[in-house]
């Protein structure tokens, strides 16, 4: 059954992480030190043994000029022996229920490949972040300042005013630099990722407040976009694409004019 983890589960969770993701002990210890929060970690036990896990981490996210909370989902893993039993489906569904209960309007994750991309689509996730080759200037930020706090101040100034971007605090920045230094200052860029709208009417109202567009929402399962008689008919995934402005210039002009194209940014998530 799905339950919250406890602090006593940490070593077992680390072992699963090592088995599934093959990360170094340094990375695993760093991740758990700053990201393992028992009541934000879901596990599935069979005969007392943890066989699957999902981590949720709260971040501030800029969305249509407002700051909202999102949950970043990571470490989604099931031991190979227990896959194809719908265990991860249960963890993701429970995580969505928890987000609704906690008034978290948005979920974000990074998909490792096309197979898991298709899997997450079943749960209303859609790609809204693109990978690119633009280098994040960590080396310049570190080498041009006298303290890490000064480096963070400039880092924060780069992203603080950007819409559709996760905000990192100073502790996050310290962790980012520790991982980056351990990786021999490996070049970092923006990564591809997916989002899921958990509170569609709340987020749509932020869009309406910012733009003054006042049409109503109507939901259907099919991924199409129809605007007729002041009613926007969409799926949850389609609405997510529109609100993020993800390649909206490719849509019909009437829709593209209402939802201008943006460049959502996702990076430095201990991915």
Regions found by a protein language model. Give the residues of each.
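Short amphipathic alpha-helix that is part of the acyltransferase structural core
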Residues: 1-58, 65-68, 72, 138-170
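Short hydrophobic/aromatic beta-strand element in the GNAT-like acyltransferase core
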Residues: 39-43, 53, 75, 184-188, ...
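Conserved acetyl-CoA-binding loop-helix of GNAT-fold acetyltransferases
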Residues: 78, 84-97, 122
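Long, hydrophobic, well-ordered secondary-structure blocks that form the structural core
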Residues: 106-137
């Amino acid at each position: 059954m799905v339950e919250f983890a406890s602090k006593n589960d940490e070593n077992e969770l680390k072992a699963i992480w090592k088995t599934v993701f093959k990360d170094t002990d340094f990375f695993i210890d760093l991740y758990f030190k700053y990201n393992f929060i028992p009541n934000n970690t879901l596990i599935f036990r069979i005969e007392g043994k943890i066989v699957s896990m999902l981590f949720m981490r709260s971040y501030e996210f800029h969305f249509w000029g407002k700051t909202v909370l999102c949950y970043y989902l990571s470490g989604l893993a099931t031991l190979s022996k227990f896959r194809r039993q719908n265990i991860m489906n249960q963890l993701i569904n429970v995580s969505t229920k928890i987000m609704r209960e906690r008034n978290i309007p948005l979920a974000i994750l990074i998909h490792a490949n096309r197979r898991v991309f298709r899997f997450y689509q079943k749960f209303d996730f859609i790609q809204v972040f693109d990978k690119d080759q633009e280098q994040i200037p960590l080396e310049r930020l570190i080498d041009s300042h006298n303290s890490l706090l000064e480096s963070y101040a400039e880092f924060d100034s780069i992203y603080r005013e950007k819409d559709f971007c996760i905000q990192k605090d100073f502790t996050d920045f310290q962790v980012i630099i520790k991982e980056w230094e351990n990786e021999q200052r490996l070049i970092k860029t923006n990564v591809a990722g997916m989002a899921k709208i958990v509170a569609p009417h709340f987020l749509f109202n932020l869009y309406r407040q910012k733009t003054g567009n006042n049409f109503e929402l109507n939901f259907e399962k099919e991924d199409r976009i129809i605007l007729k008689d002041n009613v926007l008919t969409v799926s949850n995934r389609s609405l997510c694409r529109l609100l993020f402005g993800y390649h909206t210039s490719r849509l019909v002009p009437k829709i593209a004019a209402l939802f201008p194209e943006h460049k959502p940014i996702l990076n430095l998530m201990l991915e």
